């Protein structure tokens, strides 16, 4: 028996190595027939000795019995989508934003010549997945889903032959989440469709649909028979840092058995990125797989952290999409549509033409700035493109074909739906401590909910799944309710009676009662859902979550000054003013008051300020937010350390200021606060922060007085009551430094289920080790809420 077990282990190791050389390195060392012989030998031995079968055996990729449904998986780190670039100018603008966002001297996080270095790789057209490894073994696979919650497809990903069930080599972190794309090659797609035709099965329109459909089969045996492949492009959660650069991470993953794009390249500056894009574009048709663009990422991971995220995409990455098929047609007219926020948007009505196999009669024009940029006139011959391979877009006017009777495109002075006045939006910018107002690209109907179009879209948004989640209220039902004047605002939904609903088209006794129950059940939304449901311009689902998590009460959100709102992640000054303007509007306030008053809504998850927000409001942070000319974060820190309070800075004389800063910066600070409007605005911001419960000193001084100051803690294994990120946040709020590695300087190790080498090392060093219950007890003792 010992000999059989030894032979099984030898065969598994040998087959794993051959899989690695074939699928990852593309350097097979044996012919297929020899691989098959070894595989069948292992399969026979395991059949004779089923007690020796393990989940990571190469034979266990064949699939199992059908599942009844997929379970939900919450991503510890959201799987975000990328922003898109369609033109070279978009890439240049992206590079400018990155460079300005880093605001670092050349050579610090930059490459040669002070240029940002980017990783470059093709954008595979497949399905994004997450692979979670613990102690080197694949324990879970999940789809991206909505970015926050995906589906558990662990059984199916195990059948994808180039996904390692166990990592190669050594040095990988205890917890490693690999992210990448499951796709189907062009040849594999053709073979699949041919075989489907032979058996009279369903064929697929393209490799992307084939890959997605194959991976989400409830019967994993079907998935196992599909020619799926995987290519990794990055990381999710990990218990330890792997490298300092994105390419370094991918090289490490490749060493551990992960397939990485053979087209991966480092570019020094945006010009090299554009050259890479053109090169891949020229070779696109010769590649063995479908791609729809190229992904560029800031290579330095510290720079990525510096840039951060906005809404649902990182600021440090972009997908440069390839142009889709283009066609010529005639612009017959331009009509204007009214959206949820009142935006009056031009839409091109075209002479129908087939583009990439789809008949197109309408195209987006985005806004009037785009119409002006194109020089578009009604009657023009235009080039249209299915931008991003999906949305038809007018990209160019063929000016030489313009007819004599061509007409200019005019914005209507009154709303085409309700007749209210249409006005152009204003944008607020802050530069050198001063605000300036410029004209925006968007025109808006001022009718608000008195406008039927806005009311319908506002209600559709309010009841949507990610907002108040009121089932049974479809678009057609909402149109009926508005047209019959049964509702004039979201608050009126809660006043609907059974007699009103049953008279609507498509409703009977059961469906009417179900709808009334769904409306009643929506009376206790989370704060984040309610904020999102209000439909504040430029406030999407992620920003609503940030507002709720950070400010933790609707009253604080309503009162917050724009500058205070900019403390929050991904909230810029323009969005901050949109939020402020929304809550200052008398009509909006009356609707909210009605919802929370007579309609009986009770918002959940309100309470104390979020720890992340609290930690961000240091004195030096406030000084930096004031945008004093020539004063950056370093100078702000010096001012905070020197004076300790905002009032001391405002009232400091010239000599005191010169002791803190060089002459130019000192003069800039004095000139700024000599303007009484600037001084009063700074005081108002500070007063509101303190009113919200913030009492800061300089960050350095604050940490010194905290109970865990000077202590280094390490988290390992999994936690059940809170995520590791939340635990880290709570420990840091008490002054602790949370590290990813154990050393003699470590004060305490928190070990949950699955703790590996870090726990072993902690025991060897004789360190204090706490389980999750002990951690929670310690946090409670120190006055930190754990629920």
From Swiss-Prot:
Domain BRCT: 703-787
Binding site for Zn(2+): 415, 418, 445, 451
EC number from the UniProt entry: 6.5.1.2
Reported cofactor(s): Mg(2+); Mn(2+)
Binding site for NAD(+): 32-36, 81-82, 121, 144, 181, 297, 321
One GO process term, biological-process aspect: DNA replication
Record key words, sorted: DNA damage, DNA repair, DNA replication, Ligase, Magnesium, Manganese, Metal-binding, NAD, Zinc
Catalytic activity: NAD(+) + (deoxyribonucleotide)n-3'-hydroxyl + 5'-phospho-(deoxyribonucleotide)m = (deoxyribonucleotide)n+m + AMP + beta-nicotinamide D-nucleotide
SUPFAM superfamilies membership: BRCT domain, DNA ligase/mRNA capping enzyme, catalytic domain, Nucleic acid-binding proteins, RuvA domain 2-like
Active site: 123 (n6-amp-lysine intermediate)
Role, per record: DNA ligase that catalyzes the formation of phosphodiester linkages between 5'-phosphoryl and 3'-hydroxyl groups in double-stranded DNA using NAD as a coenzyme and as the energy source for the reaction. It is essential for DNA replication and repair of damaged DNA.
Family: Belongs to the NAD-dependent DNA ligase family. LigA subfamily.
UniProt name for this protein: DNA ligase
């Amino acid at each position: 028996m010992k000999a059989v077990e030894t032979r099984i282990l030898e065969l598994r190791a040998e087959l794993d190595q051959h899989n690695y050389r074939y699928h990852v390195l593309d350097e097979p060392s044996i012919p297929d027939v020899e691989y098959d012989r070894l595989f069948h030998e292992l399969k026979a031995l395991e059949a004779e000795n089923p007690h020796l079968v393990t989940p990571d055996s190469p034979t266990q990729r064949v699939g199992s019995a059908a599942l009844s449904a997929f379970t939900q998986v919450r991503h510890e780190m959201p799987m975000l989508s990328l922003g898109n670039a369609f033109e070279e100018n978009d890439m240049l603008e992206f590079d400018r934003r990155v460079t300005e966002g880093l605001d670092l001297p050349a050579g610090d996080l930059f490459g040669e010549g002070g240029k940002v270095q980017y990783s470059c790789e093709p954008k595979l057209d497949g399905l994004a997945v997450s692979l979670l490894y613990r102690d080197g073994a694949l324990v879970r696979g999940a789809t991206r889903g909505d970015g926050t919650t995906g589906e558990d497809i662990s059984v199916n990903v195990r059948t994808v032959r180039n996904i390692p069930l166990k990592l190669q080599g050594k040095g990988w972190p205890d917890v490693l989440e690999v992210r990448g794309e499951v796709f189907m090659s062009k040849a594999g797609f053709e073979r699949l469709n041919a075989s489907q035709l032979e058996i009279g099965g369903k064929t697929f329109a393209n490799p992307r649909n084939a890959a997605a459909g194959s991976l989400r089969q409830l019967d994993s045996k079907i998935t196992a028979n599909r020619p799926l492949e995987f290519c990794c492009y990055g990381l999710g959660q990990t218990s330890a840092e792997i490298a300092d650069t994105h390419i370094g991470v991918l090289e490490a993953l490749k060493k551990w058995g992960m397939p990485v794009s053979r087209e991966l390249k480092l570019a020094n500056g945006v010009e090299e990125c554009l050259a890479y894009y053109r090169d891949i574009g020229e070779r696109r048709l010769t590649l063995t797989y479908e791609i729809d663009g190229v992904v560029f990422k800031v290579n330095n991971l510290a720079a990525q952290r510096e840039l951060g995220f906005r809404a649902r995409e990182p600021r440090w990455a972009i997908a440069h999409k390839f142009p889709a098929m283009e066609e010529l047609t005639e612009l017959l007219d331009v009509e204007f549509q009214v959206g949820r926020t009142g935006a009056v948007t031009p839409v091109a009505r075209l002479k129908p033409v087939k583009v990439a196999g789809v008949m197109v009669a309408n195209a987006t024009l985005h806004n009037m700035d785009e119409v002006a940029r194109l020089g578009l006139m009604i009657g023009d011959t235009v080039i249209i493109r299915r931008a991003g391979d999906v949305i038809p877009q007018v990209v160019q006017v063929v000016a030489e074909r313009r007819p004599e009777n061509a007409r200019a495109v005019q914005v209507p002075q009154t709303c085409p739906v309700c007749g209210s006045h249409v006005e152009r939006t204003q944008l607020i910018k802050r530069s050198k401590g001063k605000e300036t107002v410029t004209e925006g690209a968007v025109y808006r109907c001022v009718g608000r909910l008195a406008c039927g179009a806005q009311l319908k879209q506002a209600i559709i948004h309010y009841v949507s799944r990610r907002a108040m989640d009121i089932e049974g209220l479809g678009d057609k039902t909402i149109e009926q309710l508005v047209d019959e004047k049964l509702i004039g605002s979201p608050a009126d939904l809660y006043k609907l009676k059974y007699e009103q609903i049953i008279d609507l088209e498509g409703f009977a006794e059961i469906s009417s009662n179900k709808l009334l129950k769904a409306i009643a059940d929506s009376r206790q939304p989370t704060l984040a859902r309610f904020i999102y449901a209000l439909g504040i311009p430029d406030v999407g689902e992620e920003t609503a979550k940030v507002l709720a998590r950070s400010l933790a009460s609707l009253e604080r959100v309503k009162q917050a000054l724009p500058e205070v709102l900019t403390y929050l992640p991904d909230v810029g000054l323009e969005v901050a003013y949109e939020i402020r303007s929304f809550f200052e509007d008398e009509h909006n306030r009356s609707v909210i008051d009605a919802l929370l008053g007579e309609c009986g809504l009770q918002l959940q998850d309100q309470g104390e300020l979020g720890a992340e927000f609290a930690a961000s409001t240091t004195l030096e942070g406030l000084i930096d937010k004031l945008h004093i000319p020539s004063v950056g974060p370093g100078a702000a820190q010096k001012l905070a350390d020197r004076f300790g309070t905002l009032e001391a800075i405002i009232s400091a004389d010239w000599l005191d200021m010169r002791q803190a800063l060089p002459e130019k910066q000192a003069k800039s600070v004095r000139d700024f606060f000599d303007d009484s409007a600037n001084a009063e605005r700074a005081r108002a911001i500070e007063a509101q922060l303190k009113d919200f419960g913030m009492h800061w000193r300089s960050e350095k001084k604050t940490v010194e007085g905290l109970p865990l100051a000077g202590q280094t803690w390490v988290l390992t294994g999994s936690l059940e009551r809170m995520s590791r990120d939340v635990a880290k946040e709570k420990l840091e709020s008490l002054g602790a430094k949370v590290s990813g590695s154990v050393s003699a300087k470590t004060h305490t190790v928190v070990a949950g289920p699955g703790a590996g080498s870090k726990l072993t090392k902690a025991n060897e060093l004789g360190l204090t080790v706490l389980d999750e219950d002990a951690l929670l007890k310690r946090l409670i003792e120190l006055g930190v809420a754990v629920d």
